[in-house]
Amino acid sequence: VSTLSGEDIERQGITTLEDFSRFVSNLNVQTTAPGQNTIVFRGVSDGGGFLVDPTAAIYLDEQAMSMTSMAPDIYPIDIARIEALSGPQSTLFGASSQTGTVRVVTNKPDMEGTEITGNMAIGVSGVSKGENGFDFDATANIPIIEDKLAARVSIFSAEDGGFIDSVAGMSVVDEYTGLGGLVSNYDPVNPHTDTVEDDINGVEWWGRRAAVKWQISDDWAATVTHNHQEIEANGFNDFDPMVGDLETVKF
């Protein structure tokens, strides 16, 4: 098991599965767009085909988060650690764990004491030849009944700056078409100006998490968790070197 603690995640500025994979041997994450990933352990993959169940799973605590054809990004706010378990994990984690599992473990409500505690973080970032970004998150731990009942709430909002430009030009569609495979996204009658834009691959994140823990007895505890996250991305992270550096033609 390879593990990164919450402190390591914050220190390294990790926000995506692809970021996390750079610190774990035998793990590769192929990202086509924010929130659309293929997890590959030891070079074994289903190929990321359409409507194909993944061979590696991602979990948030004990909840499976894998989706058909992809693994979503879980924004790492108030995280205790992220684990990468290489090799078959079907006994512990069930379906989609044939090659391995990535598990995001959150901090749980702390019932000790009677005072509300919390933290808040604000950051800014920039991308060379691209946009600026920001991130904001806040967490509060609320003891309700000492040693019996507590709640924990987190919120976040972030924006990663884009750096891929969509320009007017010619795109190769099919080398066997009568046009030689070249179709322009510029037409005097219908110029498609809506497809020409700088920094099209910017992404916005926002969401919240809430958990309530009840210590029923010395041997039994129950935790109820709500997690909501949205990702809005305007474009893919690919570009065409035949068009230009960090440029592509969309139509």
Segments and roles (model prediction):
Residues A56, D61-P88, A138, G180-L182:
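Short acidic/polar hinge/loop motifs at secondary-structure boundaries
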Residues I9, F20-S21, I82-G87, V102-V105, ...:
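Non-catalytic regulatory/gating segments with a bias toward low-complexity or hydrophobic composition
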Residues V1-Q12, F20, N37-I39, A56, ...:
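N-terminal periplasmic "start-of-domain" segments of outer-membrane beta-barrel proteins
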Residues N37, P54-A56, E112-G118, D147-A151, ...:
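Outer-envelope beta-barrel architecture signal
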Residues L17, T38-V40, Y59, A84, ...:
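N-terminal periplasmic accessory domains that precede
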